[in-house]
């Protein structure tokens, strides 16, 4: 049972007799999940918290703590250099995040944790790191902490990174290993988790 699905920017070739079918998009490779991977598991990564909620919560908590129990110069007391440096970092984080999300859209898969991953991305920023969106969140968060002069936000980054690593990334990787099998293990061997 082989069929081709023509779309504006990519061609999907599906061969259910093989463990993995190939998606070719603009010369970039992605792998479809095997039939066994789709049938034998819940089809999403069971993360403890969605990363946007984790980072937004840390920003709000950091600002609240900075207001109630000030550390350092105080919330919103950044000078021009701090605003420029923090703003530049925030823009870098936003740009990296946008490039990363664009790869999901090009491949036709969901970027939202808790929804099925239909392809293994290996193009764009995913050639250099397995988690460019989370790196983008960290850069954006760090930039905001500098702009807001919130020492609490910087301190909260430590538990945020632990929760991100243990409660999100490790669970997503277990899901992707189960779903994409050998293709994901080869990707893990070739591309670092972070940088």
Regions found by a protein language model. Name each.
Residues 2-13:
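Extreme N-terminal basic, low-complexity initiation segments
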Residues 11, 22-23:
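Leucine-biased recognition of intrinsically disordered, low-complexity hydrophobic segments
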Residues 26-27, 37:
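Residue-identity detector for glycine
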Residues 34-123, 135-195:
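Membrane-anchoring alpha-helices and their flanking helix-loop junctions
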Residues 126:
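Solvent-exposed interhelical
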Residues 131:
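Extended, alpha-helix-rich binding/interface surfaces that flank or overlap catalytic cores
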């Amino acid at each position: 049972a082989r069929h081709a699905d023509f779309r504006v920017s990519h061609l999907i070739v599906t061969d259910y007799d093989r463990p993995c079918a190939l998606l070719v998009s603009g010369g970039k490779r992605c792998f479809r999940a095997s039939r066994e991977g789709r049938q034998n598991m819940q089809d999403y990564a069971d993360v403890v918290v969605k990363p946007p909620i984790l980072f937004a919560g840390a920003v709000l908590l950091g600002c609240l703590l900075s207001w109630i129990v000030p550390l350092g110069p105080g919330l919103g007391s950044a000078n021009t250099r701090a605003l420029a440096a923090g703003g530049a970092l925030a823009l870098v984080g936003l740009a990296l995040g946008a490039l990363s999300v664009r790869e999901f859209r090009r491949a036709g898969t969901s970027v939202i944790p808790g929804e099925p991953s239909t392809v293994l991305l290996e193009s764009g920023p995913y050639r250099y790191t397995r988690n460019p969106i989370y790196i983008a969140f960290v850069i954006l968060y760090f930039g905001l902490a500098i702009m807001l002069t919130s020492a609490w936000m910087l301190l909260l980054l430590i538990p945020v990174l632990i929760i991100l690593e243990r409660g999100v990334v490790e669970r997503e990787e277990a899901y992707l290993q189960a779903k994409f099998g050998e293709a994901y293990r080869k990707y893990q061997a070739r591309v670092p988790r972070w940088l």
